[in-house]
Swiss-Prot record:
Cited function: Catalytic subunit of the DNA primase complex and component of the DNA polymerase alpha complex (also known as the alpha DNA polymerase-primase complex - primosome/replisome) which play an essential role in the initiation of DNA synthesis. During the S phase of the cell cycle, the DNA polymerase alpha complex (composed of a catalytic subunit POLA1, an accessory subunit POLA2 and two primase subunits, the catalytic subunit PRIM1 and the regulatory subunit PRIM2) is recruited to DNA at the replicative forks via direct interactions with MCM10 and WDHD1.
GO BP annotations listed: DNA replication initiation; DNA replication, synthesis of primer
Protein name: DNA primase small subunit
Outcome reported for the amino acid change (mutating residue 324 to A): Strongly decreases primase activity, which can be partially rescued by increasing primase concentration
Enzyme's top EC category: transferase
Native source species: Homo sapiens (Human)
Gene3D superfamilies with a match to the protein in the record: DNA primase, PRIM domain
Amino acid sequence: METFDPTELPELLKLYYRRLFPYSQYYRWLNYGGVIKNYFQHREFSFTLKDDIYIRYQSFNNQSDLEKEMQKMNPYKIDIGAVYSHRPNQHNTVKLGAFQAQEKELVFDIDMTDYDDVRRCCSSADICPKCWTLMTMAIRIIDRALKEDFGFKHRLWVYSGRRGVHCWVCDESVRKLSSAVRSGIVEYLSLVKGGQDVKKKVHLSEKIHPFIRKSINIIKKYFEEYALVNQDILENKESWDKILALVPETIHDELQQSFQKSHNSLQRWEHLKKVASRYQNNIKNDKYGPWLEWEIMLQYCFPRLDINVSKGINHLLKSPFSVHPKTGRISVPIDLQKVDQFDPFTVPTISFICRELDAISTNEEEKEENEAESDVKHRTRDYKKTSLAPYVKVFEHFLENLDKSRKGELLKKSDLQKDF
């Protein structure tokens, strides 16, 4: 993938919003079948323009209105907010206190910077294949719980374009949830607690909740290769001292000695498991709980959610198919059938897909000179000729399931009415 030059972004965005952005699918998503009157019209969008100019409370009548505005403004970033009681672009005309956020998808934001205390390869905004496994585990753990523990059907996972992932839960019942219920859900999904000053961030009680057991089973599939080989979390004294801080002091000396005699993280982990197991058998009710090995695995691998993003109904989150202005990468949907294969470094940049389009356009110009073709039809075909196509397909698959589910619900309702 070619390098992205941020100085080219203004020109690239013009082309992207004119010829490549998947407007029809995007509108189809946020309109939700047009079942609820004014649902799309009451949705808040925010645009971040060049030089960090930020405009909130944008709203649009229809797909055409949205397209025109995006092509006029060429936003560097698009965020999606709640569905309000009134049109957001008229919020200043509404009586004080009457303008209220009413519905929104339940959203989750997982950012790699929140793992800086446990990843050794990168820090802050940087990511690499060695630490991306954290995002793979996060998607697997959170998605399994949303699907199986809560019964949520319509979950859209999206790469942020730089260092994290977002999830949009779009079931109709979920969009209506109160802030209190959202807080309860995100609390259920949170285990790693405490700021930078807190060394031990995971505390398990003797009774292990099924959610934790299932999460551990997912982590186990990745732990050896991710934590012991790639992150090498027991490589040297500095790294193993961090782990010793998570276990009772009474076993520190024994572990120090065995760690010094061992040659690598794999061997040291085996020693730790043996010593911890022996300790657990001897002391049933220690304040550290009986699950030392699991607590370490969870602290190093369990998802770290930004709680505030999930609990607030009026919280804005970056839109799918927005462009990251620093990396140039498109914020693309992730195929849940291929989570392990998803590679953020192969996600196309805006410069790459615009070059692809240029190359194709040059070849086709002669052919199309004689053909009258509508701009919409032309654009629908345009993204299909670029590396964006497979990601739009993932999005379309998600939308098809949403449509099927909605039609099923409408049929159920009409059958019930017939019974009366």
